Amino acid sequence: MAFLILLRHGKSVWNEKNLFTGWVDIPLSQKGIDEAMLAGEAIKDLPIDCIFTSSLVRSLMTALLAMTHHNSKKIPYIVHDDPEQKHMSKIYSDEVNHMIPLYRSSALNERMYGELQGKNKKKTAEQFGEEQVKLWRRSYKTAPPNGESLYDTGQRTIPYFQETIFPLLQNSKNVFVSAHGNSLRSLIMDIEKLSEEEVHSLELPTGKPIVYLWTGHTFERHPELFG
């Protein structure tokens, strides 16, 4: 058995400005920092053996801030996967016993919003119509201009999960994933076997952990950590 913790990053500066963010590398706002800390309080008693984040800073900030509350007191360290940099994260002392490896991958990035990135969501709805923007944001296979649909996002997130994260769970390793609304929606769609219609209405608030227990045969959703 193993725990899988999924956490959408805390609010970013652009979330608060109501702008499409996508792959633009925007940091957390003060509210987002507070949300990450509260999320850390919520999961502080759950065992964590390794951490995965996207390549975007708001995802990394959320994971690092949350882990400052963890009862293990272990320190996350970024593992460099590039062969030319791999030696940089090697630890040559027993300090390794007080660390938790953290892996970053663009496979977990938010969906790429293409030509909507940086645009105000309200003004975009006024320009293209609310139904068109809703279709871009919530439908399964319709992508914004030069961007990704949720289906496209799942084409990178799900293989990464199945090839890299799931084997760890099968080996009873507890995994914490800090990522984004749409990258996590695509993973939850796969984990819970949701239909296209069901994922259409799936909303993930910022800074609220979702916890699954891998039983060895299936994923079971953990009771809510927040009231």
Swiss-Prot record:
SMART domains given in the database record: PGAM
Gene Ontology molecular function terms on file: phosphoglycerate mutase activity
Keyword Isomerase tagged: yes
Entry EC no(s): 5.4.2.11
Keyword Isomerase annotated: yes
Site features described as Transition state stabilizer, chain residue numbers: H180
Catalysed reactions listed for this entry: (2R)-2-phosphoglycerate = (2R)-3-phosphoglycerate
InterPro entries: His_Pase_superF_clade-1 (IPR013078), His_PPase_superfam (IPR029033), Phosphogly_mut1 (IPR005952)
Keywords attached to this entry: Gluconeogenesis, Glycolysis, Isomerase
Stretches assigned to coiled coil: none
Enzyme class: isomerase
Family per similarity comment: Belongs to the phosphoglycerate mutase family. BPG-dependent PGAM subfamily.
Function: Catalyzes the interconversion of 2-phosphoglycerate and 3-phosphoglycerate.
Name recorded for this polypeptide: 2,3-bisphosphoglycerate-dependent phosphoglycerate mutase
Native organism: Chlamydia abortus (strain DSM 27085 / S26/3)
